[in-house]
């Protein structure tokens, strides 16, 4: 019912509302608030509560400018993905340990109704949060330079200050048992107080059809959460919720191994990248 209402307000009635900017703003803002209210629970870790209390992606973006019907749809997809991912992270029950390293890095997993199996990476990075945010958001397209699991990331479209459509080409994995995949996703990034959330989910983008020789996989809902480590603001607590449908026929054991290992490797590659950039800045 809610999605039908959104379509009516932001889609089917677009021509009628295009000369009624104030009403159009109010309609979409109300829908954003209702999405938040229905998705969020009452009990969650402090950093999630902080983001939830102050997060209204639709509201903040629509106050800045008006968007096309398709752009509004992308914004809504990003908002729903963020709230769904935060809802999954806020539920502390049912997580099982998949992998743990001596330095404390760990990957947990659980099965979520209507989503499937999700993986949760928990690490502490010895770098300030702003450095991670800059690397993961501002320099997103450079990820292929330091993460061998990613061949390329391109921003296909930017919508406002928080939302982008991306195409990601992933390298083969598990000794080529898992061939190359690509993903088309809508991503949104929110900074609220001392917490940053980077969320995403698979979407359709007409200008990026499926590529020959590459399986189009789907992400989502997924998110990365960054916030200063309590008592050590120069360090960052990094949480990555990963939900992926790799498509194709693959044994579950292979999928579980690939995804948990991918998260562990990502943490190591990210640390090396940040250490390298810090050293370069120190020499300048």
Swiss-Prot record:
InterPro entries for this protein: StAR, StAR-like, START-like_dom_sf, START_lipid-bd_dom
Key words of the record: Lipid transport, Lipid-binding, Mitochondrion, Phosphoprotein, Steroidogenesis, Transit peptide, Transport
A biological-process GO annotation: intracellular cholesterol transport
Keyword Phosphoprotein in annotation: yes
Stored Gene3D superfamilies: 3.30.530.20
Pathway this chain belongs to: Steroid metabolism; cholesterol metabolism
GO cellular component terms given for this protein: mitochondrion
SMART domains for the chain: START
Subcellular location: Mitochondrion
Transit peptide: 1-62
Subunit and interaction comment: May interact with TSPO.
Function: Plays a key role in steroid hormone synthesis by enhancing the metabolism of cholesterol into pregnenolone. Mediates the transfer of cholesterol from the outer mitochondrial membrane to the inner mitochondrial membrane where it is cleaved to pregnenolone.
Protein name: Steroidogenic acute regulatory protein, mitochondrial
Species: Mesocricetus auratus
Gene name of this polypeptide: STAR
